[in-house]
């Protein structure tokens, strides 16, 4: 289910408050549509606009001319190129209940039920009109105030998806959105920073600024998605008549046939459904995929598909009556950066974290956001006290995109970087973007040991953080190998360690020695690897000796390890050699059950390969499997890591994301976006019970 909007209408108590609200909304809209930045985020603006509309409904004789409720785009900056047909805005709904009210109103207006709705993504970009004369793109115009827009034809040639020449020599106007994809936005900020500029706050801000820039020393790409096709003066009469009569869905097929980029090639194409209930279901499907899309959406657009229904409904001065925007909760909000905390990870990495003025995004209160590293802070020009744009989509960790520079008051303060490790006071290695304590793992011994003892690593029951601290402070443990050298009398001498606790811990340590190599490797905390990568390395090389003997070229043969990562993994393993030797001497297992070591490289230099790929012949041989949701039945007690281990023992490969290459998605209770994407792509789905039957031979 998609979350309901969490921002109700602003409460306006009198005419003075109403006038101030109109002024604030007009100022925000003008800034937003002129340059893509605004003192209000989307939720705050929607809340203000709804409050204005509610006050005007009760005081219809006191409506001010600057009110956003009567203006296209809330009062955007005007241009001097008139539109042949007004470019209107869309009215909004925020819940299934409001959508039901809108469909009932539409049915009353046209005196019949709508039987075909077109449902597609509401792209978070800038609306433009592209005019083609005899198939050639001659002019590009912004929406402006809806009646006239700004000529931005200088941007022709920099917008992907907007062809310079159509597939047929027709005279038409194509309407759509210009935006930046996530990749284009990241590239644009890199280029902008290299040229001495402040980073853009978000992709829409970047697209708006780039589209209007006429004299800039650099160019960055943008992307166009078409959503309209109409006749111009000079269009062939037969074609003009056909465009008037086509259903909206066929109009978009015609545009795509001319070479125009539409939503059809995305994971969220426009689809036609027959009932309001099916519309809401499609809204939920698109909302579930939102976090994984390579471009921003802020809602779903629902249109009456048939031309007859659109004509009968007509349009108001601000918006068509046959279309509505079903708004989704904002994934970006503006809040203040109050402080920066510096945390030390288990490998000694010193990571900054932004402390925020609490802000609600997608139903969750966000008080912290990642800042990546000191170089990223410098690139973005962040200061304490800054208003910042915070982004969070789905389960992604919230991140600070950029400062909202025009809201600065002059009281903001520089962010002070640490001169010594905030954990142990040692020197800091600043030779790479990610700063690291010079003591490395020793700085964070307690965290490293607690991590190694965790359920998904060595699974040492009874060895939590409190017990690890006790062992370290007693001088009994200085590294992971020391755990396996502990003697009964040493443990009995500790406070709160009786005979039962001691015997249980020693038994858990004995069991940990028998864990597969993949878990031992994961427990070592090799930088650049995690649970999944540790399994791949262990199953490829089969023994720790083969891993230690591998050079960077051999390491690259492991799926997912590229040219850049391989040398660092090899170097890390070499650095850990003394610890690995001590673990082996203590009796810790150094082999991966069921795995076969790779054959040596041929004498002519050919790559070595495994004699038999791990798991060949298993029930999941050659399959890429994704697990999502809560497991039930025989799988209920398995952690996600244990599920992934099971998949790989069965010959498959575990993955965290769904794509066209996914073979199977195991969807448990509460499965959300991954299940929706699997259905969208036609990927095979299985319940936990069905999957348990499939791998029954491997379940203990």
Curated annotation (Swiss-Prot):
Listed name of the protein: DNA ligase 2
GO molecular function list: DNA ligase (NAD+) activity; metal ion binding
Organism in which the protein naturally occurs: Streptomyces coelicolor (strain ATCC BAA-471 / A3(2) / M145)
This protein's UniProt keywords: DNA damage, DNA repair, DNA replication, Ligase, Magnesium, Manganese, Metal-binding, NAD, Zinc
Region (Disordered): 590-621
BRCT domain mapped to chain residues: 615-700
Keyword Transport: no
Active site, renumbered: 122
Cofactors named for this entry: Mg(2+); Mn(2+)
Residue positions binding NAD(+): 42-46, 89-90, 143, 177, 303, 327
Physiological role: DNA ligase that catalyzes the formation of phosphodiester linkages between 5'-phosphoryl and 3'-hydroxyl groups in double-stranded DNA using NAD as a coenzyme and as the energy source for the reaction. It is essential for DNA replication and repair of damaged DNA.
UniProt-listed InterPro entries: BRCT_dom, BRCT_dom_sf, DisA/LigA_HHH, DNA_ligase, DNA_ligase_AS, DNAligase_adenylation, DNAligase_N, NA-bd_OB-fold
Chain positions recorded as Zn(2+) binding sites: 421, 424, 437, 443
Top-rank lineage group of the source organism: Bacteria
């Amino acid at each position: 289910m998609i979350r309901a909007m969490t921002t109700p209408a602003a409460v306006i108590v009198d005419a003075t408050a109403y006038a101030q609200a109109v002024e604030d909304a007009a100022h925000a809209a003008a800034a937003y549509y002129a340059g893509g930045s605004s003192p209000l985020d989307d939720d705050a603006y929607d809340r203000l606009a709804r409050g204005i509309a509610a006050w005007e409904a009760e005081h219809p004789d006191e409506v001010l001319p600057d009110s956003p409720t009567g203006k296209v785009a809330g009062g955007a900056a005007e241009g001097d190129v008139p539109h042949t047909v007004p470019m209107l805005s869309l009215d909004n709904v925020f819940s299934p209940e409001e959508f039901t009210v809108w469909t009932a109103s539409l049915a009353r207006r046209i005196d019949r039920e709508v039987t075909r709705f077109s449902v597609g993504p509401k792209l978070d970009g800038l609306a433009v009109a592209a005019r083609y004369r005899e198939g050639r793109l001659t002019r590009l115009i912004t929406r402006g105030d809806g009646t006239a827009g700004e000529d931005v034809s200088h941007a022709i040639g920099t917008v992907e998806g907007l062809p310079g020449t159509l597939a047929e020599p027709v005279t038409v106007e194509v309407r759509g959105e210009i935006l930046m994809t996530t990749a284009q936005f990241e590239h644009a900020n890199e280029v902008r920073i290299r040229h001495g500029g402040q980073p853009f706050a978000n992709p829409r801000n970047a697209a708006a600024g780039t589209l209007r820039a006429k004299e800039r020393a650099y160019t960055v790409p943008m992307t166009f998605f078409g959503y309209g096709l109409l006749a111009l003066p000079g269009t062939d009469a037969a074609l003009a008549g056909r465009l008037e009569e086509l259903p909206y869905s066929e109009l978009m097929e015609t545009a795509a046939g001319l070479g125009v980029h539409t939503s059809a090639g995305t994971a969220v194409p426009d689809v036609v459904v027959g009932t309001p209930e099916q519309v809401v279901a499609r809204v939920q499907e698109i909302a579930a995929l939102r976090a994984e899309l390579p471009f921003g959406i802020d809602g779903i657009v629902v249109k009456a598909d048939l031309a007859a229904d659109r004509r009968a409904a007509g349009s108001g001065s601000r918006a068509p009556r046959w279309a509505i925007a079903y708004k989704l909760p904002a994934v970006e909000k503006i809040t203040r950066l109050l402080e920066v905390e510096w945390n030390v990870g288990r490998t000694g990495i010193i990571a900054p974290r932004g402390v925020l003025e609490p802000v609600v995004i997608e139903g969750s209160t966000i008080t912290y956001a990642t800042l990546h590293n000191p170089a990223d802070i410098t690139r973005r020009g962040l200061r304490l006290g800054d208003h910042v744009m915070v982004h969070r989509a789905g389960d992604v960790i919230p991140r600070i995109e950029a400062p909202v520079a025009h809201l600065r008051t002059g009281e903001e303060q520089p962010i002070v970087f640490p001169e010594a490790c905030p954990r142990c006071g040692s020197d800091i290695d600043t030779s790479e973007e990610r700063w690291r304590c010079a003591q490395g793992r020793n700085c964070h011994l307690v965290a490293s040991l607690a991590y190694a003892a965790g359920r998904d690593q060595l699974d040492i029951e009874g060895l939590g953080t409190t017990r690890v601290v006790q062992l370290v402070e007693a001088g009994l443990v200085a590294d992971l190998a020391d755990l396996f050298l502990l003697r009964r009398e040493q443990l009995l001498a500790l406070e709160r360690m009786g005979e039962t606790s001691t015997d249980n811990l020693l038994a858990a340590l004995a069991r940990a020695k028998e864990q597969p190599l993949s878990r031992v490797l994961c427990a070592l905390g090799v930088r650049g690897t995690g649970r999944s990568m540790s399994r791949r390395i262990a199953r490829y090389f089969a023994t720790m000796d083969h891993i230690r003997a591998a050079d960077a070229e051999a390491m690259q043969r492991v799926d997912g390890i590229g040219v850049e990562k391989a040398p660092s993994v090899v170097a890390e393993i070499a650095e850990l050699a003394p610890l690995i030797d001590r673990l082996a001497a203590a009796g810790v297992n150094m082999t991966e059950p069921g795995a076969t070591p790779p054959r040596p490289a041929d004498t002519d230099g050919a790559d070595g390969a495994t004699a038999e790929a791990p798991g060949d012949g298993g029930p999941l041989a050659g399959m890429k499997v994704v697990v999502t949701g809560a497991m039930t039945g025989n799988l209920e007690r398995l952690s996600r890591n244990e599920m992934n281990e099971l998949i790989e023992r069965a010959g498959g490969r575990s993955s965290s994301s769904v794509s066209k290459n996914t073979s199977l998605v195991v969807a448990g209770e509460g499965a959300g976006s991954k299940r929706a994407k699997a259905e969208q792509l036609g990927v095979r789905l299985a319940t936990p019970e069905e999957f348990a039957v499939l791998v029954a031979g491997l379940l203990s």
